[in-house]
Amino acid sequence: MQAMEGEVLLPALYEEEEEEEEEEEEVEEEEEQVQKGGSVGSLSVNKHRGLSLTETELEELRAQVLQLVAELEETRELAGQHEDDSLELQGLLEDERLASAQQAEVFTKQIQQLQGELRSLREEISLLEHEKESELKEIEQELHLAQAEIQSLRQAAEDSATEHESDIASLQEDLCRMQNELEDMERIRGDYEMEIASLRAEMEMKSSEPSGSLGLSDYSGLQEELQELRERYHFLNEEYRALQESNSSLTGQLADLESERTQRATERWLQSQTLSMTSAESQTSEMDFLEPDPEMQLLRQQLRDAEEQMHGMKNKCQELCCELEELQHHRQVSEEEQRRLQRELKCAQNEVLRFQTSHSVTQNEELKSRLCTLQKKYDTSQDEQNELLKMQLQLQTELRQLKVMKSTLVENQSEKELLCRLQKLHLQHQNVTCEKEKLLERQQQLQEELQCHEAELQHLRDTVASFKESNEKDTETHAQLQEMKQLYQASKDELERQKHMYDQLEQDLLLCQLELKELKASHPIPEDKGKCANKCDTLLSRLTELQEKYKASQKEMGQLQMEQCELLEDQRRMQEEQGQLQEELHRLTLPLPKSGLLLKSQELLTKLEDLCELQLLYQGMQEEQKKLIQNQDCVLKEQLEIHEELRRFKESHFQEVLENPDDSKLAKSSKCNRNKQSKLLMEQMQALQVMYDAGQAKQELLQQEQGRLLEERKRLQADLQLCLEEMQLLQVQSPSIKMSLESYGKSYGSMVPSNENCRKTYDTTVDDNESYYKSYTSTQTSSKSFLKSYDSSTSASEAYGKSYCTTSNSSITYKKSYGSTSSSDTCQKSFVSSCTDEEPAEPEDMERFEEMVVKVLIKLQAVQAMYQISQEEHSQLQEQMEKLLAKQKDLKEELDACEREFKECMECLEKPMAPQNDKNEIKELQTKLRELQLQYQASMDEQGRLLVVQEQLEGQLQCCQEELRQLREKRPSVVKEARGKNANKNMNKNANGVKMKKVTKPCSDTSESDLETRKSLEVVLYYKASQRKLDGLAKEEEKKEEMEEEKKQVKEEAKEQCGDELVAEPADPEEAKSTEDQEENEEDKEEEEKEEDSEEEEDDADSSLESPEENNPLRLSESKKSSPTPNPPIFSLPLVGLVVISALLWCWWAETSS
């Protein structure tokens, strides 16, 4: 802490001492000038007087001349060195300019490439938009056509409905006409009944008269007339019944309800008629019984014969009607079968249309076979229907013949007229039924067409829904884009915040410079108070305690590493034992097991259990290592807290110094105490360096151990490959090896990715070890200053923790992968050794042996499962733009396939469409097309958004380039202003005869300007950072390091030359300054390694500004003050140390602000 404060306050102390010494030297120089003027006057007087000079005066003059000559030679050497430095800086500046020009060319090429890609993407987007617009226009045209067809179909359906209604009205008129004719028939029957009643009344009157009065001739005539009337009545009644039944059957086909009503009326009339007939027959039977007559018997016989004939005709008509109904039922069944077959045919056609894009031959063959079978069924059903129609026509012709035969029996004119009317009505009914069937067929066709158009309309609605879904997806993607924009805005705000932070740091640096100038102008720094010393001592004690804790944790870490090495050795030993177990297991896998294998399998099981226990032990040790790493992190956090307390104490100490300035003598006394404290800190840092050396040695041992394990793994893989070849050669000899080979193939497939995993983890451990070495070297270079060494130690410990974690993980994965190799080797490695001839075992041993083999295989499978779990996590991700392009291509292909399917569906619409059950399949095709269109639209929208983001990024890149250019323009002006002031101060002080070691004040000013330029350069480099140029920058950095080493050598030589003149100073300040110079040189090396780019630009600026200072030294000195002595050197030796101190100040301010 005190060493750091000394480093911070050292420039102020030097400047105050130099001011005091300059004042004293000015007084002495004035006195010397007066003396020299007096001596010159005395010499001239003496010369005029002819007197000679004394020897003492000659010696003084000679000493002055020699001193002036020596100073002149030194100034010439320094001028030559500065000229060389200026040339080197000019070369570096030209290299930097070339690098910036090359970088600008690379940027322009990248911008041109991006612009070309943007143009190509815009052209693709325009083409896709044109295609989409054309597709939309085609779909709209198809929509208009479908709507026109739907309207025409609706008009046709309305026309058919009106025709159907007119047909129904005509049929209703015919029905009314038939009802009127039936009423006329009923009226005629009433007349006949009246005549019969009158005849019966006359007969009764005649029978009531005496029998004697009646003659046999009259009686016989009456009986004949009565018989004739009865026969006529019965015939007419039967004929009426037949006509009524035929009429009811015909009218029943038109209107079932009206036919039922007429049938009920006829049945009621028949019941009344039979009652009347039975009453009349009873009366006649009574009369016959009273007066039997042969003529009456003849009439009765004829009546019975006629009744039997009518019953026969009636039965035949009923049989024909039953056959006709059966044929109609069969026809309906055949029509239903035909419809079902048509539906199946349509389903098959739809399936064919659906799977036309598929490339599977088997599915196409199955569909063709199904279509052939359905076509055959349809043809058979058509043939059956044709046969049924022929049978129906034959039956109708037979029915007509029977009706014609029936009409021959009718002798009455009125009955013939009725039959003619009935035939006409029957023909009209047949015509009406045919027309009705035609209308039904037409109606079915119209319904099918209407269904097709409805399906098409549904398809169009689905397309509209798909467009809506695509719009929803567009909104979702827009929301995602907004989120990306927000993230980008957040990152941009973060960049602005960092830039603002850099600006604040620059402002703080300027304030610090102003405060330093005020301190230089006012009073020297006083000695610290007792309280501040006590606080510093307590903080140092806490720091030592934390370092001891850190050492203890490092020792524990080393012990854990040793235990890990022991575990690795145990693992190798278990590996050898596992190889022996594999050989024994191969002996067990033979088709005829040998005796004594049961014990070997038991030993194998015990060894596998030991291996599992060892793995669990290893995992426990890894958990302990993780806990120790966490404890180490806690210790580092405590160190960070102490560092913050130190920073706060330093700030408060600065404030106290500004508020309470004292004499300069106190500052000189406090310098010794700070030097002692800095020595203590140096010893502590050396102890830390020794500790880091030990850690590095341990890490190298671990790396060598891992390399040896990797070599052993490669050797085992080579042995495994040889065993596999031997197994393939011996496969022909025994069939049981096939099972072992299959299990080996599975285990080897799981082993290959585990090998890759092991290699990857080993590569990561090597990289982490390299990072650890880099960080450790950085700790070695920065071990002289507390802050730098602390930062590097924290980074080194973090890198060491990471590398240690990766080594532990790599050892775990290596162990897992080795377990997989050992489990897979069990199926092949010792097969050759198992071919030895031994005696076969007993059946009991065979059974036990099989059980043990099963257990061993289960154990090995469990070990393989553990390694497969770790392999599943390694999957590579593709870039988003490539995914989108691939997805776009797939969507284009699917869209083309859907367009082909749509065209085929439109062609199928011209053919007779499928029934209503096929709507589901058509809807599935429509939904699929809609999903494809949605995916295509989403991909197009996503591509457009990516293009927009790309344009925004290009615009931001241009803005960053403009800012970079502005910063470069501002930088030279600021540097020139600062350098002009510093050059004036340097020339004034050198003209007054200042010594070599006292030119620290202008150097501190130049360091301030260097800090300003460094801040601006860091802002520039922040924007110039590019991942693509890291390799080139690494090579350039190596060259620059060589150049800087040469410059350091030149500076050290200059320091050695000028060291003789610094002997006259007191001992303590010389020692303090020499140690500080060494620290500063080491810190300078560290800064040169970390910030080479920024220092190159600073050197360029220094060279550009120092060259005019060296060219015009006398003019600036003459403008200030004339001196009789020669020009002293412009730059002196402590310049490098002050530059390093200024760099440390800048780092301290950066850390406190962060």
Swiss-Prot record:
InterPro entries: Cent_Immune-Sig_Mod. Residues 14-32, 1077-1109 have a biased composition (Acidic residues). Residues 1-48, 1031-1131 are annotated as: Disordered. Its main location: membrane. One of its GO terms (biological process) is spermatogenesis. Restriction fragment length polymorphisms (RFLPs) in gastric cancer showed loss of 5 kb fragment in comparison with the corresponding normal tissue. The chain crosses the membrane at residues 1130-1150. Residues 696-733, 859-974 form a coiled coil. May play a role in acrosome formation in spermatogenesis and in fertilization. The keyword Phosphoprotein applies. The keyword Phosphoprotein applies. It comes from the Eukaryota. This is Coiled-coil domain-containing protein 136. Keywords: Coiled coil, Cytoplasmic vesicle, Differentiation, Fertilization, Membrane, Phosphoprotein, Spermatogenesis, Transmembrane, Transmembrane helix. It is found in: Cytoplasmic vesicle, Secretory vesicle, Acrosome membrane. GO terms for cellular component: acrosomal membrane. It is a single-pass membrane protein. The modification Phosphoserine is found at S52. Residues 1031-1058 have a biased composition (Basic and acidic residues). Expressed in gastric tissues. Down-regulated in gastric cancer.
